[in-house]
């Protein structure tokens, strides 16, 4: 209902779908490509229209296959990477995919391992088209 109401007003719904489960009493997200695709397929079916619906997705292995499974515009989530250089490389590769429109990053920019926020932000900005 919320997605329909947003669309009726020409407002964007940003969906951040995950397949989650409890392991040892803690909720965890399944970040396999197949799980991300499944969560997207479920989310894409919400509402009477997807005209104003965007996805917010984690960068996972096989992002080209993941993005082939949707026509919706998508923003990439930064996640909590252990290796910033690896994260930047995976973001750059994913940003080249046609329906990826940008990044939504937080901790990676605010708390880089080397404490150089300016450099981390500059690196991310250089990737966005």
PLM regions: where:
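Alpha/beta enzyme core
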Residues: 1-72, 82-102, 127
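Glycine-rich phosphate-binding active-site loops on the catalytic face of alpha/beta enzymes
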Residues: 79-81, 98-115
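C-terminal helical cap(s) of enzyme catalytic domains, especially alpha/beta-barrels
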Residues: 110-129
